[in-house]
Amino acid sequence: TQGVKEITLLGQNVNAYFYEQKDETIDFVTLLEYISEVPGVERIKYTTSHPKEFSDRLIASYRTMDKLVDHVHLPVQSGSDKILESMKRGYTRIQYLKIIKDLKAARSSVSISSDFIVGFPGETEADFEETISLVDEVNFDGSFSFMYSPRPGTPAAALPDHVPLNVKKDRLARLQAKLSKNALHYNQLMVGNEYEVFVEGLSKKDSSKLSGRTSNNKVVNF
């Protein structure tokens, strides 16, 4: 491994990985197990995972595989079952929350980040409030959020009841304020504790300092 201490598996729906050969079947967890046995590797990351493919076996690996970092990025997109179905996400709000609950039970220190889209066609204020309530319930540690914008030729572009731009902007601002507040609270809980930091290079803000990340994906400059 030539001194490599951290490996990141990158892919869209990366946890859906599956490889089959004559005498062996390798799923995502098996791949993680193989990597964890590589001498010198101390941290394993992956992104981006999909809730539909987040198996009980993958959740259980957070009990046994110490090299998996304390962070999972698990895009939910919406807290409304109606919108999730319209998006064809393949899971419900309850199913998503169960994954989070089981992950926290497997490893209480794991932090969760996510992706959100507001203003998807047909999203009502009630649907949006379900997203807000999901954010309150999970307490995400940082997330990415966007306004829906139609792309010609996609199924969503042909859906009725497109949300006005001013409404989308308002909902995005409200969601981001909530997400930022939760992320700040999470950061404040870390104050006064010690964390191992893997150095990634020089600080972008001050080249006289180093920059790295904690196991729960916090950037640290020192």
Indicate where each model-derived feature is located:
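P-loop NTP-binding/switch modules centered on Walker-like glycine-rich loops
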Residues: I132
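Terminal RNA-binding accessory module
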Residues: A158-F222
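Contiguous mid-protein beta-loop-alpha structural module that forms a pocket-lining wall or clamp
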Residues: E123, V135-F140
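Radical SAM enzyme [4Fe-4S]-AdoMet core and its adjacent flexible, acidic
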Residues: F18-S36, G40-V41, M87, P150-K181
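Hydrophobic, well-ordered secondary-structure elements that form the walls
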Residues: L74, D115, V135, S143, ...
